[in-house]
């Protein structure tokens, strides 16, 4: 028994160093558990790649069954083959006319007859004026009233007098009154 150390304690027999033996056993168990975890991860990775291989095989079988192998380009992807076979739509190129870029005032002033004949109405014609609704309508009635007063008082009409409006005071905006004023 030359090569055997007689003084070395045997595991499980109890010896002088019982705590060291227990520590080595717990370390060995931890290594086995880590190995099992790593083995479980390896098994999951292998199952994942097997699943991918099965999916590729099924796609290949499907494309061969439907006759899409040539259109797929050999990679077994029938969907991309259909996309390549589809014709591209031409780009959208709208046709513009100069009428599309004219201002409302120019279109209403110059093309009233054209708009009436073609059945198209401009925004100005639809709103009944300049597009400001009630304010435009109010100005129109004031002008009509002034014109009616001018017709009644033709004999007494004096030179045009400049009068400022009471409700809408805008600098530089003046209204010419027809007829005499009592002030």
Swiss-Prot record:
Going by the UniProt record, its keywords in alphabetical order are: Nucleus, Plant defense
Against Pfam families, the record matches this protein to:
NPR1_interact
Question: Acidic residues bias: where?
Answer: 31-40, 101-115, 150-161
Keyword Nucleus tagged: yes
Q: Name one GO biological process term.
A: regulation of systemic acquired resistance
Return the Gly residues bias intervals.
Answer: 70-79
**Coarse class of the protein's main subcellular location:** nucleus
Chain positions covered by the region annotation Disordered? 1-40, 66-183
InterPro entries listed in its UniProt record: NPR1/NH1-interacting
Q: Name one GO cellular component term.
A: nucleus
Q: Where is the composition biased (Basic and acidic residues)?
A: 135-145, 163-183
What do we know about how this protein assembles, alone or with others? Interacts with NPR1/NH1. Interacts with NPR3/NH3.
**Role noted for this protein:** Binds to and represses NPR1/NH1-mediated transcriptional activation of LG2 in vitro.
Which family does this protein fall into?
Belongs to the NPR1-interactor family.
Protein name (database record): NRR repressor homolog 1
The species this protein was found in: Oryza sativa subsp. japonica (Rice)
């Amino acid at each position: 028994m030359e090569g055997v150390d007689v003084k070395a304690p045997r595991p499980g027999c109890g010896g002088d160093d019982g705590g060291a033996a227990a520590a080595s056993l717990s370390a060995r168990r931890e290594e086995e558990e880590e190995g099992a975890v790593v083995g479980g991860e390896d098994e999951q990775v292998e199952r994942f790649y097997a699943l991918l291989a099965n999916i590729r095989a099924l796609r290949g079988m499907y494309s061969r069954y439907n006759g899409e192998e040539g259109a797929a380009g050999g990679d077994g992807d029938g969907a991309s083959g259909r996309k390549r076979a589809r014709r591209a739509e031409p780009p959208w190129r709208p046709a513009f006319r100069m009428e599309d870029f004219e201002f409302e005032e120019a279109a209403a002033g110059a093309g009233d007859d054209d708009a009436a004949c073609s059945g198209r109405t401009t925004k100005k014609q639809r709103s009944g004026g300049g597009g400001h609704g009630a304010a435009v309508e109010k100005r129109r009635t004031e002008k009509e009233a002034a014109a009616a007063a001018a017709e009644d008082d033709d004999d007494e009409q004096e030179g045009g007098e400049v009068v400022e409006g009471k409700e809408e005071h805008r600098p530089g905006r003046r209204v010419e009154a027809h007829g005499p004023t009592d002030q």
